[in-house]
From Swiss-Prot:
Main function: Ferredoxins are iron-sulfur proteins that transfer electrons in a wide variety of metabolic reactions.
NCBIfam families, alphabetized: fdx_plant
Origin species: Dunaliella salina
Official protein name in the record: Ferredoxin-1
Cofactors demanded by this protein: [2Fe-2S] cluster
Length: 95
């Protein structure tokens, strides 16, 4: 599994995420309260920004290439592919 550091407005949380778990799901199981809405990768409620490390969010359908290249990630459909650090609650910074 990978160690994902979530930088939330209420502080930093470290969550262990297995390769087959979405980051949002693993965070919830660990008791970390992250925003979400559709849980299907088709809105921006759960958006975060990857500061370091890598993720696979091929299931998402909302972000464009520029947003993904900038590091934005939809945590509800993102798998960690390495240890990574993600800033959460980034929806308002997408636009």
């Amino acid at each position: 599994s990978y160690m994902v550091t979530l930088k939330t407005p209420s502080g930093e949380q470290k969550v262990e995420v297995s390769p087959d778990s979405y980051i949002l799901d693993a965070a919830e199981e660990a008791g970390v309260d992250l925003p979400y809405s559709c849980r299907a990768g088709s809105c921006s409620s759960c958006a975060g920004k990857v500061e370091s490390g890598t993720v696979d969010q091929s299931d998402q359908s909302f972000l464009d290439d520029d947003q993904m290249d900038s590091g934005f990630v939809l945590t509800c459909v993102a798998y960690a592919t390495s240890d990574c650090t993600i800033v959460t609650h980034q929806e308002e910074n997408l636009y």
